[in-house]
Amino acid sequence: MKYRSMENRFCMSLVAFAVIARLLLATGVSAALDSAVGLAPKPETPDEPDVFLLEILEPERMPDEPPAQPQAPDEPDESPEPEAEPVEAPLMFSADEADAISIAGACSYRPDKQALLTRPSALSIPEDGPAVLIVHTHSSEAYTMEAGFEYPESDALRTLDERYSVIRVGDEIADILTEAGISVLHDTQPNDYPNYNGAYERMRQTIEEYLAEYPSIRMVLDVHRDAAEDADGNPVALTAEVNGEACAELMLVVGTDEGGLTHPDWQENLANALKVQALLNRAAPGLCRNLDLRTERFNQHETPGSLLVEVGASGNTLAEALRAARIFGQALAVFLRGQMSTKGS
């Protein structure tokens, strides 16, 4: 089985994250993610995490506070009091944020967005072992070519070259999550070539193999590229401007049981998707399309943390998709960090 494992590199304490989470809630995520939309080369020291998530704020001593005095050597040692367990600041969402998210799609269900968005997530991210599995049901999906981004096509707007397909987009998301201290597995094996039909069934088997080998996995993220055409059949780009840069639009897709297949946790998946989209709306208003609620399952019944994201469309460039992927990865990292370890694994 071919896959890419992103080793977990925790770079901050829970106490630090609590402080930063409160700052993010107070000031909004938008300023914190400004750096996520550029296409500058990755730093030579990838172990250095993104500042907005992992910067450690050390407490300062008041100017007139005397320095701590050393203990006299003849005083008996006293057992220190046990330190209190750090408490992470919970992510909070408002009714207005629920109203700002439009749900579309073929599904006839009308879920209560406010109730789902504002209730605590049941997702619990473990500290040990891979927590997120990134997959690509349609692994050969690619983007409109531009100078410097040419690739050999396996079919129209498809390629087996991982550097130019949605697998490259998955790499970007995996890097962001790993830098945030979230352990990731990235499945990069071809899944829709040479036969496009049956891709979801093949991916279901792959997901179940991963879940059996890595029971710590809590979220399965299926990364796609959407297809959009004009009346003449030409690819259409779906773009949003974020901090002066063109980004591919994002669409979160959530499956249900309306098609008749068993899917008991679809509302939990939807609740998590709403939270991620609310964080994206804070960071980059206008980047997300309507949340797509569907009658199909899309293999999301495998875990209550499943999510499908469409990063751009066939008319977008890879550069636009990578900018969007970085913003998505940052928002997803904030959400997942909020579900870490205080609930157990």
Where would I find each of the regions flagged by the language model?
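N-terminal catalytic or cofactor-binding beta/alpha core of small enzyme domains
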Residues: 10-218, 227-233, 326, 336-344
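Structural recognition of the beta-strand scaffold that forms the well-ordered cores
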Residues: 133-136, 184-186, 219-222, 251-254, ...
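Solvent-exposed loop/turn segments at secondary-structure junctions
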Residues: 139-142, 190-194, 225-230, 257-260, ...
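Active-site-adjacent substrate-binding region
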Residues: 265-292
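Active-site-adjacent mobile loop/cap segments within catalytic or ligand-binding domains
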Residues: 286-345
